[in-house]
């Protein structure tokens, strides 16, 4: 991160003992920071080495300061301080305009900022002295322009004329955020809950404050006590979703979305245990994103009875992105930087944790979560260590699960044969399962068998560890239906027949965007801009004009753009469903009729052979621009309708697959699948 080619002088082997006692003044108009920092260490020494932002003028009290090196980008400098007498406290003065990277990542938020608009500082800019270890305690007094407030890690102490931040917890990074905030706070048990807004909105603040305590209570019961003195939601003018120790930084638009208190909020609160409580050793795999997604995002869906669909979408993302040539082992995942990496570090990872929960049972899984917290809080661990803590002493199980971390890919399952024969006390069932990928995985596969006279299927848990395996069952009644992994409990590559028609099937592969050659110039240009934006995000996408589309391979996936598209007439029958009809300038969906004059319509179809065809109906440049922005966030849907004027979603449907190959009816009369109910993950 620091791009400096040397190693800092170690401060000692002790696991504790580095503390900052700081005073920081923000000179917003000039963009300067003025600071004094006394760094306390656990043993006396005569030489200290540290890294600090190169924009500062630095002075060491009672010591001689030498520059060791400056980073290639000129942003950070490494210093050595030599003292005449060994001491356990180094006092530094530094002042100046911090230098920040000129690279602006997607979303537009700079690396750091000190201006009249506000302050954002984190360790990436070395705005405070960085040593060779994390710090164990902090006391920081912050002096700001009139009317400003600050947010940082730890507990807020307001003495009237000054505000300070203090913590006795170990931390790996120090943040300073400041600006003209409106603060709303309430006490929940021993935790201060607060919302910091750039524009005052008491109702919005109350919406968050009303839920925070419930979430901290839930995770405290499940894992262990909440580790910090506060939790704060802080508004950011850039559209971020960052989780820091004891607070989250949410973009102003993000913050006001009605679903965020029920999705992002529990996710960011849980990160105070996973990621900001137990830290991630990124060189050994980022386990925290998958575990947090599982225990927050998946849990919220579980509470609503929608966990099965959530897991299906997770497998869709993994099958469509990572499996399309963009895969990597979980041990190699560090952070999300595109849809493919998200499908691995979030989707596949959470499915591995879900599979482990099913194999251990909820009681043992929760005990493992508590063990992970108790053994590793405020230490840095990789994926293997995290998994080992949850699994415990079962070394054979750990060996099996370690393979899931080390390998790319996932099982691709196929039913080879099913044999049913009567026997004196019922029926004998034999199912032959094949793993089609290179090299078998070792896992437990749920197999649901619906029996005559029983409304709810019986679910067997079968150990699978070979490329081809026959599973045999003695049943008391006649089997009517077989479903392999019907609730999507195993991290696997979905068969094409299982995949619901969805935009992600087009985004994740090598689909063709078919442009409407006869569209008016302004409309055609809008489609070209959409194509360029999507190709930057999804490198597999290619473009072709509709009058050239006859040269496409008949098996090529395609997305037909525009009501004027020459391919629409021949393809409209593909989009026929029992509740759906595509017309020349609109569509009937359920009991409603949508017109191209007022709505933009998105439909996706998948054939029995796995060919995916999509259609986007829009003919206004502003509506096309709206779809270019929105649709990448709706990848799991196969049917969408947006109001052209407001951009609001009028329809967003997840469609069911038509030809699931891992489900077999064994009798002439179709039998519905009903699975046993499940409990949500809870310590209660």
What kind of feature is each model-predicted range?
Residues 134, 249-311, 369, 383:
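Zinc-dependent metallopeptidase catalytic helix centered on the HExxH motif
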Residues 168, 259, 283, 289-355, ...:
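Acidic/His/Gly-enriched intrinsically disordered linker/tail segments
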């Amino acid at each position: 991160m620091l791009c400096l080619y040397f190693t800092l002088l170690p401060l000692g082997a002790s696991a504790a003992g580095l503390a900052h006692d700081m005073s920081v003044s923000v000179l917003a108009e000039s963009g300067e920071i003025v600071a004094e920092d006394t760094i306390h260490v656990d043993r006396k020494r005569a030489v200290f080495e540290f890294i600090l932002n190169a924009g500062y003028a630095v002075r060491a009290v009672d010591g001689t300061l030498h520059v060791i090196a400056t980073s290639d980008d000129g942003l950070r400098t490494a210093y050595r301080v030599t003292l005449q007498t060994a001491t356990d406290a180094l006092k530094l003065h530094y002042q100046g305009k911090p230098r920040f990277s000129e690279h602006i990542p997607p979303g537009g938020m700079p690396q750091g900022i000190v201006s009249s608009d506000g302050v954002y500082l984190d360790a990436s800019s070395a705005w405070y002295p960085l040593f060779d270890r994390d710090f164990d305690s902090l006391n920081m007094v912050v002096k700001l322009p009139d009317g400003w407030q600050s947010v940082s890690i730890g507990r807020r102490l307001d003495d009237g004329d000054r505000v300070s931040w203090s913590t006795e917890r170990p931390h790996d990074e120090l943040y300073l955020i400041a600006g003209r905030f409106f603060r709303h706070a309430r006490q929940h048990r021993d935790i201060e809950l607060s919302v910091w807004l750039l524009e005052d909105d008491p109702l919005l603040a109350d919406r968050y404050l009303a839920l925070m305590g419930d979430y901290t209570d839930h995770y405290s019961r499940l894992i262990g006590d909440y580790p910090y003195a506060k939790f704060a939601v802080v508004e950011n003018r850039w559209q971020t979703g960052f989780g820091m120790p004891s607070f989250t930084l949410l973009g102003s638009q993000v913050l006001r979305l009605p679903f965020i208190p029920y999705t992002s909020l529990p996710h960011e609160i849980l990160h105070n245990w996973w990621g900001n409580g137990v830290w991630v050793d990124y060189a050994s795999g980022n386990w925290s994103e998958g575990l947090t997604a599982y225990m927050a995002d998946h849990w919220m869906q579980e509470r609503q009875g929608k966990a099965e669909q959530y897991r299906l979408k997770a497998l869709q993302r993994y099958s469509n992105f990572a499996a399309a040539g963009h895969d990597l082992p979980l041990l190699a995942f560090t952070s999300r930087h595109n849809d493919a990496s998200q499908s691995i570090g979030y989707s596949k990872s959470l499915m591995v944790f879900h599979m482990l929960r099913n194999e251990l049972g909820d009681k043992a899984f929760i005990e493992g979560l508590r063990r992970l917290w108790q053994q590793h809080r405020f230490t840095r661990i990789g994926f293997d260590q995290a998994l080992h803590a949850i699994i415990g002493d079962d070394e054979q199980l750990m060996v099996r699960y370690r393979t899931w971390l080390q390998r790319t890919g996932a099982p691709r399952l196929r039913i080879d044969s099913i044999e049913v024969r009567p026997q004196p006390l019922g029926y004998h069932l034999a199912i032959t399962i094949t793993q089609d990928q290179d090299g078998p995985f070792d896992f437990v596969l749920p197999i649901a068998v619906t029996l005559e006279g029983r409304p709810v299927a019986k679910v067997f848990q079968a150990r699978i560890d070979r490329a081809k395996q026959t599973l045999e069952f003695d049943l008391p009644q006649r089997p009517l239906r077989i479903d392999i992994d019907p609730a999507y409990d195993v991290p696997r590559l979905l068969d094409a027949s299982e995949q619901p028609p969805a935009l992600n099937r087009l985004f994740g592969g090598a689909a063709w965007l078919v442009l409407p050659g006869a569209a008016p110039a302004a409309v055609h240009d809008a489609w070209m801009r959409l194509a360029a934006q999507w190709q930057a995000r999804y490198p597999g996408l290619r473009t072709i004009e509709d009058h050239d589309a006859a040269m496409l391979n008949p098996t090529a996936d395609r997305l037909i753009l525009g009501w004027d598209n020459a391919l629409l007439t021949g393809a409209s029958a593909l989009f026929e469903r029992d509740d759906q009809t595509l017309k020349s300038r609109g569509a009937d969906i359920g009991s409603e009729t949508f017109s191209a004059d007022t709505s933009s319509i998105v439909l996706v179809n998948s054939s029995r052979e796995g060919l995916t065809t999509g259609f986007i109906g829009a003919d206004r440049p502003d509506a096309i621009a709206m779809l270019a922005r929105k649709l990448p966030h709706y990848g799991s849907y196969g049917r969408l309708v947006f109001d052209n004027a407001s951009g609001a979603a009028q329809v967003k449907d997840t469609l069911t697959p038509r030809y699931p190959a891992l489900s077999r009816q064994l009798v002439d009369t179709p039998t519905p699948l009903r699975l046993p109910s499940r409990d949500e993950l809870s310590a209660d």
